[in-house]
């Protein structure tokens, strides 16, 4: 199988493993790349030296291309009053686990739009592929990465975002449907069109010149074949890889994905401050009922991480972040290379 995107990415199969910060590992990315797909690591939650170490660890495990994903969200606007109100709202939940709420919240991730040290690191390490989530970095950063010979992907959720990415000069579009697990790539969370994968792929392939990578709800070879018949050049799968032994998903996450909760996923902003889809637990109930205004992403996420840590100290996972897409019930447990091989075989069936 060959198409222009596979040639551009220098991969054999139209299978891309989603970056998934907190779940993806260098071992997972390398296994997917070594099997002929495109493995991915997410460095949006890492500082420069952590990110460099992840890149080098992945490169030591594969001589094939892999994708490095960055968060390009609008930097958070601190609002002490709003943050204090949110912590006061969460205080009874912390008390349930005999823990005080944090005194204050932090902006725990630096957006790539203003992280020029991260840009310099990427220009030094030169990964084959870099992808953007939540938006686009400054044009100067895009131009510098392209000049270094790096292939650029942008996650988009509607036509307006796709046209913006196309105009900026990226090489391909990741069309993320509303079915997808994890954070929505939407540039402006207040303007989410909530388009499903199939409709989005058709709209983008009709209106854009760039290759389209379909993402959201795709779990098997039949799904990959379906989106390619709609015009996609490849598919990006995330939830499908969570049960692989190479992922860093913990036992509670793996158990949930193989149980009844996999059948109920929902999008909420209450966990992090930006919309994201996961398996429903108390995050989706207690944090949304009579809640005050949320702090900005990722400041709100700092509160959730503290609450989950307090619960975990009492052996409770009710507030764990367990991202998953609508295809979650179809997740399969096997090594990543075996899954890629199975997906490729299913595509031909």
UniProtKB/Swiss-Prot annotation:
A Pfam family that the UniProt record links to this protein: NMO
Induction: Constitutively expressed.
Keywords: Detoxification, Flavoprotein, FMN, Monooxygenase, Nucleotide-binding, Oxidoreductase
InterPro entries given in the database record: Aldolase_TIM, NMO
GO biological process annotation, one example: response to toxic substance
Endpoints of the signal sequence: none
Cofactor note: Binds 1 FMN per subunit.
A GO term for molecular function: nitronate monooxygenase activity
Additional free-text comment from the UniProt record: At physiological pH, 3-nitropropionate (3-NPA) exists in equilibrium with its conjugate base, propionate-3-nitronate (P3N). P3N is a potent irreversible inhibitor of the key enzyme succinate dehydrogenase in the Krebs cycle and electron transport chain. P3N has been shown to be a toxic metabolite to bacteria, plants, fungi, mammals or any organism that uses succinate dehydrogenase.
Role of this protein: Nitronate monooxygenase that uses molecular oxygen to catalyze the oxidative denitrification of alkyl nitronates. Acts on propionate 3-nitronate (P3N), the presumed physiological substrate. Is likely involved in the degradation of P3N, that allows Pseudomonas sp. JS189 to grow on 3-nitropropionate/P3N as the sole source of nitrogen, carbon, and energy. Also probably functions in the detoxification of P3N, a metabolic poison produced by plants and fungi as a defense mechanism.
Family, similarity comment: Belongs to the nitronate monooxygenase family. NMO class I subfamily.
Protein name: Nitronate monooxygenase
Organism of derivation: Pseudomonas sp
């Amino acid at each position: 199988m060959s198409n222009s995107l596979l040639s551009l990415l220098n991969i054999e199969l139209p299978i891309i493993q989603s970056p998934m910060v907190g779940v993806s590992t260098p071992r997972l990315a390398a296994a997917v790349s070594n099997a002929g797909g495109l493995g991915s690591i997410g460095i949006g939650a890492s500082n420069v030296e952590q990110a460099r170490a992840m890149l080098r660890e992945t490169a030591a495990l594969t001589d094939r291309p892999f994708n490095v994903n960055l968060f390009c969200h609008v930097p958070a606007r601190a609002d002490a009053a709003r943050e204090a109100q949110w912590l006061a709202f969460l205080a009874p939940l912390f008390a349930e686990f005999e823990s005080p709420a944090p005194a204050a919240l932090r902006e725990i991730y630096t957006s790539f739009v203003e992280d020029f040290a991260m840009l310099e690191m990427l220009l030094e390490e030169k990964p084959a592929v870099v992808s953007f989530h939540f938006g686009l970095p400054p044009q100067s950063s895009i131009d510098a990465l392209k000049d270094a010979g790096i292939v650029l992907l942008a996650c988009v959720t509607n036509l307006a975002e796709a046209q913006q990415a196309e105009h900026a000069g990226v090489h391909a579009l990741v069309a993320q449907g509303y079915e997808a697990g994890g954070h929505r790539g939407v540039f402006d969370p207040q303007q989410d069109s909530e388009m499903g994968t199939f409709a989005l792929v058709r709209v983008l392939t009709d209106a854009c010149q760039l290759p389209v990578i379909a993402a959201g709800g795709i779990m098997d070879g039949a799904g990959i074949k379906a989106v390619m018949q709609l015009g996609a050049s490849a598919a990006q799968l995330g939830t499908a890889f969570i049960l692989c032994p190479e992922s860093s998903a913990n036992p509670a996450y793996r158990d949930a994905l193989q149980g009844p909760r996999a059948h109920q996923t929902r999008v909420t902003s209450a966990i992090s401050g930006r919309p994201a889809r996961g398996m429903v637990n108390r995050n989706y109930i207690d944090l949304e009922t009579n809640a005050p205004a949320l702090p900005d992403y990722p400041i709100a996420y700092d509160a959730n991480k503290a609450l989950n840590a307090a619960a975990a100290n009492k052996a409770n996972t009710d507030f764990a972040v367990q991202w998953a897409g609508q295809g979650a019930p179809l997740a399969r447990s096997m090594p990543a290379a075996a899954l890629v091989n199975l997906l490729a075989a299913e595509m031909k069936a």
